[in-house]
């Protein structure tokens, strides 16, 4: 496969290669367990091996690629047990900070506006983006909503924990890719959650957050099962 790249200012080539490999994994052009040879990839993308190696190391930190001693790198296999644990921690984190988020949204309406704008972008994304670009952009916006939610708690350490978890959540998202109908369902759930937070209904917000995480869990499990990845 030949890739055409525009001229890159210094410092951007690694980012470009990183994005390309990430999209290839999302589109299953690079499959779970597939060996990643830096020389082969350099020829494939018509670049030197240095940015390839740097991009792969970055993907290792995100949980998309793994390095096996004496065997090299490969697209990381992900287990259902790991995904389940991540989602359990996400639920605990989200529920714990509901009251803080409600308080801060009330005191800082611009936070609610940022969350709402993210939902609007998610909706627009459904009509504008296809294939791997669609999956990557959908992930980015979904992640942004949850990131803003945790940030709205005002707890910087909680945000650090979220970011640490999130490096692996991306893996579960792309390996459990979902059709647009399910993505739209998730967007509606975001809308409903935000509505209850703005209205200050703590109990209802907790109920909707629990449903949202549970639905995500079920969708990912079903997708992995259908793809024989369980």
Identify the meaning behind each predicted range:
Residues 1-7, 203-230:
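C-terminal effector-binding regulatory domain of bacterial HTH transcription factors
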Residues 12, 183-184:
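Short helix-capping and inter-helix turn/linker motifs at the boundaries of alpha-helical repeat units
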Residues 109-175, 187-195, 204-214:
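Conserved amphipathic alpha-helical segments that form helical-bundle/coiled-coil interaction surfaces
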Residues 1-103, 225-230:
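Short linear motifs at protein or domain termini
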Residues 178-182:
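Solvent-exposed loop and edge beta-strand segments that line ligand/cofactor-binding
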Residues 79, 199-201:
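Acidic/polar helix N-cap motif
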Residues 100, 148, 152, 219:
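Short alpha-helical functional segments enriched in proximate histidine and acidic residues
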């Amino acid at each position: 496969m030949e890739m055409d790249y525009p001229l890159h200012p210094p410092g951007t080539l690694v980012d470009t290669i990183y994005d390309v490999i990430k999209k290839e994994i999302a589109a299953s052009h690079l499959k779970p367990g597939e060996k990643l040879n830096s020389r082969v990839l350099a020829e494939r993308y018509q670049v030197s091996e240095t940015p390839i190696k740097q991009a792969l190391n970055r993907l290792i930190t995100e949980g998309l690629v793994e390095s096996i001693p004496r065997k090299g790198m490969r697209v990381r296999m992900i287990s259902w047990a790991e995904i389940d644990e991540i989602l359990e921690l996400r639920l605990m984190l989200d529920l714990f900070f509901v009251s803080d988020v409600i308080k801060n949204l009330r005191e800082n309406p611009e936070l609610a506006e940022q969350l709402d704008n993210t939902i609007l972008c998610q909706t627009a994304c459904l009509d504008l983006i296809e294939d791997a670009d669609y999956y990557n952009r959908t992930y980015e916006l979904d992640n942004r909503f949850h990131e803003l939610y945790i940030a709205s708690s005002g707890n910087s350490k909680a945000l650090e924990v979220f970011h640490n978890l999130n490096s692996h959540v991306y893996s579960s998202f792309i390996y459990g890719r979902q059709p647009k109908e399910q993505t739209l369902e998730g967007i509606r759930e975001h809308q409903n959650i935000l509505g209850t937070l703005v209205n200050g209904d703590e109990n209802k917000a907790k109920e909707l957050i629990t449903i949202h995480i549970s639905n995500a869990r079920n969708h990912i499990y079903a997708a992995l099962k259908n793809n024989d990845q369980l």
